[in-house]
A protein has these predicted regions:
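Generic structural signal for residues in well-ordered beta-strands
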Residues: 28-30, 96, 145
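Extended alpha-helical targeting/anchoring segments
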Residues: 195-670
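Active-site flanking residues adjacent to catalytic metal/cofactor-binding acidic residues
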Residues: 6-7, 169, 227, 509
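Cysteine-nucleophile active-site neighborhood
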Residues: 43-120, 124, 183
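A generic "structured core" feature
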Residues: 22-24, 30-32, 37, 48-51, ...
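Extreme N-terminal starter segment of soluble prokaryotic enzymes
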Residues: 1-4
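Acyltransferase
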Residues: 171-195
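Catalytic beta-strand/loop cores that center a nucleophilic Ser/Cys/Thr
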Residues: 114-162, 594
Length: 670
């Protein structure tokens, strides 16, 4: 267990350094309280924090520096000593006052409750004190008092639910008893903090239809999240993940990018926590962590599932949002329970924490039930469909982009349009049809409050595996399927050899190589597959793979932050092109063009690019479509391509409406 000591300019800090290093066997890190920002500290490698003694008062920024943010934000074990102890009490709402008399280099016996950091410590042990201030003898909403002197001066405190402890005395003093034992207890508390998050899993060796499996889980909990390998391909999409939330640890993170507000809510609770910070900084500091379980054949071992919306470009690329999204800009659910299905081996894994096992019996009973699926029977007339930008406006935008390319403002712009469907659509039923009619390797169904997200994406944005290898699979270049095998082969060859398609793909590949180069080891960024053709029900597409080895000191959240939004949905150069997109498009993209996936406790992650996705609200649904515009683009062909892509997503509605073959999209004709 590696400790970080925040030095409040005290003369005894390196006595603490020696004591902690001796007990833990690992040399601690030491930084001054004004040496680094909180965000910079998050990039350091440490397991717990010791806030040192020091002169002054915790309410003064010059005395306490970054320690306040550590106390208020960090989700790791914290031990405050003397000034650090007072800061913990003060920033949880307590009063720090002058002591009856200053105590410097003086000794006292301590009486304690034998719990937490005092576990196994004899009572009336002798400590050395150096303080003029003291915490009031009063318990707070979140803080309890664990130890006092015989005359009632507070000597030890702890948080009621978090691993945060304070000691008024100096355990590192040569004349203090039990210093090593106290530090050993804190190290054990740190170890328990990480160990309590250990994974428990059970394997059911049985084939399941994952569609039927989700129907059962949805009946059990209609908030169940589904990362669905609806198109199974070895090495790409072998596992499907079903995420659920328990009351003990389940929580939801929503983020408002324009106001930089992170909101954390809890399962079956009115409790809410609000943080005024960037979502990426929040996750670096607060996401749960655990070791990778090598016995499992997949990377997701509990963690966050959800989306990051396109408008997060304000944080990642410093591009002001011209339009604001009406739903959260990021929405993550912490899934402390999950089912993972191995499509290759025909095995179902039930995952949870070791202290949360009872729910699995409910699931196993559920799996033994016969599922009855009630499909929508009544067919009705096709609803009104409308492009936000009609053909005339969209093609005019393409001409504007070409002028900007000629002027040297950009190389390539991913221009998008939005198809609005004006009808009440059942989100789950729509997704079940979508995965059947138009499957994708990186599909998902996320029922999130008023918004249901049904995605059949076949494009991977980012994957980080257990070896810190990052990979991305941009798609650029699309052509329709042929009527015959011979025509199909001809179209594939046309796609491979067309100069425009190759240009589109190369620009994005080089952009993503650049993005990965920001945090990968020198020489490790490679392109193992360049412009492979992948075939789907309605079209062929060109797909490239780019990969690299992440530097040891880079957190996976930084990987996401430094590559978002995905280059295949922006164009290049990225920042200038994002500004151009905001001038041309008249609405926020929201979830579309963002990313859906997971951040696992074990520091792996896997995210798609949000394409082929319906965003379903109460009385309408929207489908985003788009394409890369370069100088070689033909306006008519580009518009035909987005109509083709839209119809791929509309296939899911085929079972519910009459006259499907006569679909008329308002705005799709001159």
């Amino acid at each position: 267990m590696k400790s970080l000591i925040i030095d409040n300019y005290d003369s005894y800090t390196y006595n603490l350094f020696q004591l902690i290093g001796k007990v833990s066997g690992i040399e601690p890190l030491v930084i001054k309280n004004d040496e680094m920002t909180y965000d910079e500290i998050l990039n350091l490698d440490f397991d717990n924090v010791i806030i040192s003694p020091g002169p002054g008062s915790p309410d003064k920024a010059k005395d306490f520096g970054v320690c306040r943010e550590i106390i208020e934000k960090l989700d790791k074990p914290i031990l405050g000593i003397c000034l650090g102890h007072q800061g913990i009490y003060y920033y949880h709402g307590g009063e720090v006052v002058r002591a009856k008399e200053p105590m410097h280099g003086r000794q006292s016996p301590v009486i304690h409750n034998g719990k937490g950091i005092f576990k196994g410590i004899k009572n009336n042990f002798i400590v050395t004190r150096y303080h003029s201030l003291t915490c009031e003898d009063k318990e707070l909403d979140d803080i309890k008092i664990d130890a006092r002197t015989s005359d009632g001066i507070v000597m030890g405190i702890s948080h009621k639910t978090k691993p945060i402890y304070g000691l008024q005395f100096h355990p590192e003093s040569i004349a203090s008893d039990c210093g090593e034992e106290l530090i050993k207890n804190f190290i054990n508390i740190t170890r328990d903090f990480y160990n309590k998050n250990q994974l428990a899993y059970e394997i059911i060796d049985k084939d399941f239809d994952t569609g039927n499996l989700y129907e059962m889980l949805y009946e059990y909990d209609d908030k169940t999240l589904w990362l669905d390998s609806s198109k199974v391909e070895e090495g790409l999409s072998r596992f499907s993940i079903f995420g659920l939330q328990g009351e003990k640890r389940g929580h939801t993170i929503k983020y408002d990018v324009n106001n930089k507000i992170v909101e954390k809510t809890f399962v079956n609770s009115d409790k809410k926590e609000v943080f005024e910070e960037n979502i990426f900084y929040y996750l670096k500091a607060n996401r749960p962590r655990c070791e990778y379980d090598e016995n499992l054949p997949f990377d997701f071992q509990l963690g966050y599932i959800g989306y990051f919306g396109y408008e997060l470009k304000k944080d990642t690329e410093n591009v002001v949002n011209k339009y604001s999204y009406s739903y959260p800009d990021a929405y993550l659910k912490y899934c402390d329970r999950a089912l993972v299905y191995d499509h290759m081996e025909g095995k179902l894994y039930l995952l949870s924490y070791k202290d949360d096992l009872e729910w699995k019996e409910d699931i196993k009973n559920l799996l033994n039930k016969e599922i009855i699926i009630n499909k929508e029977e009544t067919r009705r007339d096709f609803p009104k469909l409308k492009f936000v930008k009609d053909k005339k406006t969209y093609t005019e935008d393409i001409l504007k982009i070409k002028d900007l390319i000629r002027a040297g403002e950009t190389y390539e712009v991913c221009l998008t349009n939005r198809l609005d469907i004006f009808d009440k659509i059942d989100g789950k039923n729509y997704y079940m049809e979508l995965r059947d009619k138009s499957p994708g390797q990186y599909s998902a169904f996320l029922p999130l409050d008023e918004l249901k997200i049904a995605s059949s994406s076949m494009e991977r944005f980012l994957r980080v595996d257990k070896n810190k290898i990052v990979s991305t699979k941009p798609i650029k270049g699309t052509i329709k399927r042929g009527e015959s095998k011979e025509e199909d082969e001809r179209l594939i060859e046309e796609l491979r050899s067309e100069e425009k398609t190759m240009s589109e793909n190369l620009m994005i590949v080089d952009l993503l190589r650049n993005d990965l180069g920001k945090f990968c080891e020198i020489g490790s960024v490679e392109v193992p597959k360049l412009m492979d053709v992948e075939t789907y029900k309605t079209l062929h597409q060109l797909v490239t793979t780019v990969s690299g080895k992440i530097k040891d000191d880079v957190d996976i959240i930084e990987v996401l932050e430094k590559t978002f939004p995905g280059g295949s949905m922006t164009g290049a150069p990225k920042k200038r092109t994002l500004e151009i997109i905001d001038e041309l498009e008249t609405y926020p993209r929201g979830v579309y063009s963002g990313t859906i996936g997971y951040i696992s406790n074990n520091s792996t992650m896997d995210f798609n690019i949000v394409i082929r996705t319906a965003l379903i609200e109460e009385d309408k649904a929207t489908i985003g479509v788009g394409g890369a515009i370069i100088l070689l683009s033909d306006e008519e062909e580009e518009f035909d391509e987005i109509v083709l892509k839209a119809k791929g997503s509309l296939l899911a509605l085929q079972s519910y409406y009459n006259n499907f073959d006569e679909i008329d999209i308002e705005g799709s004709k001159n």
